[in-house]
Amino acid sequence: MKPVTEPILLAAANAFDFGGPVVCDGRHYGEGHINDTYLVWRADHSKRFILQRINTDTFTDPVGLMENICGVTRHLSRKILAEGGDPGRECLNVIPTLSGAAYYIDSEGNAWRAYDFVENTVCLQQVGCEADFRTVAETLGKFQNQLADYPASTLHETIARFHDTPNRYANFEKALAADALGRAKTIAPEIAFIRAREKDCHVLLDQLAAGEIPLRVTHNDTKINNVLLDEATGKGICVIDLDTVMPGLSAYDFGDSIRTGANDCAEDEPDQSKVHFDLHLYEVFAKGYLSTAGSTMHTAEKKSLAWGAKLMTLECGIRFLTDYLEGDHYFHIARPNHNLDRARTQFTLVRQMEDVFDQMTAIVCPETDL
């Protein structure tokens, strides 16, 4: 996408109903790399807001995306209010344009949206302590629980087949057959690793097709930094970054949180001896998640959470290796073999999960007959 110019930014800032004139200094805000995010505030400094240009290279249907977000946030607001909470703080609140729309289209055809800024909160970039990880788990579980009665099938698929692991496997095989850069000969162990787990790729979608686990509203990007915590108390406040809210499985959200949080290494750690799956952190997260989401989950769905941890990690590794084979076009790289290092880290975590998989299953579903 083209860089945001000052006139485009000012026009966008003036298009929304912020309750008065606003100021924006033009600097990008936050850690995100997909959308262009800016902090704006009323000229009298009484209130702050988030203004974003939606990346339509990634999200090709911004209208459907905003329909998803508006529907889900309205539902969450009603639930929070009924529970005696504060929907102005515990849920993202979409600011309408001056004409009452949920988004604004600028002169270049780009889509913009705005939210209330949730004051006095922080988002963590990594797991600092067990208590924080449990709080994130409880907040994500509550998010799932509050959306348990939302009609998931009515949501738009904002990124097609995002967690379709069999399709990710098929894309890997296509990239391997093409071998555009001649890299296949250097990754024989990784190829064998993936192929040995081809059947595993189908487990969750087969369970869904058989009616064993339900289709749900899922976030699909449950990194720890997508949960806001109260700056003073550390209490979980709300879940943010709802662009990938789509129909999915609870195992996806649970699994991606485990993939990113229940280990002691960077995602791109080149030294595999430093990569360790942490079963204790897995248990901490599982107990927190089930304490808020478990009441709406039956045995088979709880059992699927362990599969979610394994398959979201495997799927991510497959995606990294596919990008490596295709020339590193999707994931940004900072060094040669960066995506290969990322893939190897995911595969090391998968191996370690497999070593304790019965324990993982027993933690999320003690009633399971192993």
For each of these PLM feature ranges, what is it?
Residues 26-28, 33-174, 248-250, 261, ...:
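Conserved ATP-binding subdomain of kinase catalytic cores across diverse folds
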Residues 241:
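Conserved active-site aspartate in kinases
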Residues 1-25:
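Juxta-kinase regulatory segment immediately upstream of eukaryotic protein kinase catalytic domains
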